From Swiss-Prot:
Keywords: Acetylation, Cytoplasm, Proteasome. Gene3D superfamilies: Glutamine Phosphoribosylpyrophosphate, subunit 1, domain 1 (3.60.20.10). The keyword Oxidoreductase does not apply. InterPro entries: Ntn_hydrolases_N, Proteasome_alpha, Proteasome_alpha-type, Proteasome_asu_arc, Proteasome_asu_N, Proteasome_sua/b. The lineage of its organism: Archaea, Methanobacteriati, Methanobacteriota, Stenosarchaea group, Halobacteria. Belongs to the peptidase T1A family. The gene is psmA2. Component of the proteasome core, a large protease complex with broad specificity involved in protein degradation. The H.volcanii alpha1-beta-alpha2 proteasome is able to cleave oligopeptides after Tyr and thus displays chymotrypsin-like activity. This is Proteasome subunit alpha 2. The modification N-acetylmethionine is found at residue 1. The 20S proteasome core is composed of 14 alpha and 14 beta subunits that assemble into four stacked heptameric rings, resulting in a barrel-shaped structure. The two inner rings, each composed of seven catalytic beta subunits, are sandwiched by two outer rings, each composed of seven alpha subunits. H.volcanii produces at least 2 types of 20S proteasomes: an alpha1-beta proteasome and a proteasome containing all three subunits (alpha1, alpha2, and beta) that appears to be asymmetrical with homo-oligomeric alpha1 and alpha2 rings positioned on separate ends. SMART domains: Proteasome_A_N.
């Protein structure tokens, strides 16, 4: 396909190219890749969500960057990509969860909420005068006593995962998750794995750049800075030990 032919399909959000692609959706995925990495880990006790909170300047308040969000008492989300788009999706998710709680007197299911969100995302790929959301979400929660973890895509596709990373350095973070994941992980093990995976992707990060939450039957809980510092120290110590072993070999 030559340049002029591509441009004919490049401007519309609801047009397929002859080779079956929607270019605006692909551009939205690129926006997600430009964001700082976030990840989720499903454990035997619930779900861990973690994010790297990087700032473009030392003068910017890191606390102003929100990437982990409480949706309901036992539901949380992590976001990557275009911040304003992510905020709109988080607001939509919260409203949906609250409406379901008020209507039926019980929390919305993790899968039900995810599919409602992705239905909303998918509509933006079929309507003229709109553009796809340049953000992806990880939705984690507890359903029927078990943790569940889903990821959304700018195309509106939901996927369930045991452990997954989105955003920048995704391949490196995902590889670390695959190396360390086990079905019987506890929440504490999941927190350790989350920090190890983010450290593996960027060895220059500091502990105060990390945010972690757990979502379990106890609810949505923010991990305190002291615990994060301990997890970070353990992860970096393990990394240094591995490098020493490699040099000795």
């Amino acid at each position: 396909m030559n340049r002029n032919d591509k441009q004919a399909y490049d401007r519309g959000t609801s047009l397929f190219s002859p080779d079956g692609r929607i270019y605006q959706v692909e551009y939205a995925r690129e926006a997600v890749k430009r964001g700082a990495p976030v990840l989720g880990v499903r454990t035997a006790d619930g779900v861990v969500l973690a994010a790297l909170r990087s700032t473009p300047s030392e003068l910017m308040e890191a606390e102003s960057i929100e990437k982990l969000h409480k949706l309901d008492d036992a539901l949380g989300a992590a976001t990557a990509g275009h911040v304003a788009d992510a905020r709109k999706l988080v607001d939509f998710a919260r409203t949906t969860a609250q409406r379901e709680h008020l209507r039926y007197g019980e929390p919305i299911g993790v899968e039900t909420l995810t599919k409602t969100i992705t239905d909303n995302i998918q509509e933006s790929t079929q309507s003229g005068g709109t553009r796809p959301y340049g953000a992806s979400l990880l939705i984690g929660g507890v359903e029927n006593g078990s943790g569940r973890l889903f990821a959304t895509d700018p195309s509106g596709t939901p996927q369930e995962w045991k452990a997954v990373a989105i955003g920048g350095h995704r391949e490196d973070v995902q590889a670390a998750l695959e190396d360390g994941y086990a079905e019987d992980l506890s929440l504490e093990d999941g927190l350790a794995l989350a920090v190890e995976a983010l450290v593996a992707a960027d060895e220059e990060i500091e502990s105060d750049e990390l945010n972690l939450v757990t979502v379990s039957e106890a609810g949505y809980e923010i991990v305190d800075e002291e615990t994060i510092a301990e997890l970070f120290a353990d992860a970096t110590a393990d990394d240094e030990s591995d490098e020493t072993d490699e040099r000795e070999e």
